[in-house]
Amino acid sequence: MKRGITRREREVTDMNAILEILDKSMIVHIAMIDGDEPYLVPMNYGYTMEDGKLTLYVHGATEGRKIDVLKTNPKVFIEMDCDIAPIEGKLACQYGTSYSSIMGTGTAVILEDPEEKMKALSILMKTQTGKDFEFNERLVSIVSVIRIDVAEYTAKARPIPPGLMK
């Protein structure tokens, strides 16, 4: 069963605000299923957004648990967040945390084509640093690059209430 956002008033639908969350978040948490166990890894990422279609790129070692799991079951759940700050109150129930986040489901594809890997790593580095980098086949041959085709995502935000801003 698919569920929607419980707190609809926190849903973010404005594309500029969604892009801001993607730009400010530095880490994507990627959840997978390893047999009958959940498995989660935090990773740096790059992204493209074309016509509302979100694609993420991550990289890492060419072997290990993450690669083994994704070869068996490429379905993933992603989460990223930013703008984390405490919200204080006079009563315990008034405390909370402000945030902006994106969550979604997708399919991970382990890239094999050197050209596609070079392009993906360039996107990742541009997202993370704002700078352009070039890669060659030798460099991409020693790293795995994973593309996550995000099928569905939602964005939410809970800003600090105006009266509590410092």
Segments from the language model and where they lie:
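Charged, gly/pro-rich active-site loop segments
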Residues: 2-9, 83-166
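Short, basic/aromatic recognition patches
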Residues: 1-29
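Short, structured patches in soluble enzyme cores that scaffold and shape functional sites
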Residues: 32-34, 60, 80-82, 150-152
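A generic structural signal for short beta-strands and their flanking turns/coil linkers
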Residues: 24-28, 41, 52-54, 72-76, ...
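Short beta-strand segments
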Residues: 25-62
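Short, intrinsically disordered, mixed-charge
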Residues: 23, 63, 71-76, 123-130
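Helix-adjacent hinge/juxtasegments
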Residues: 65-88, 95
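Residue-level recognition of well-ordered beta-strand positions that form the cores
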Residues: 31, 44-46, 79, 107, ...
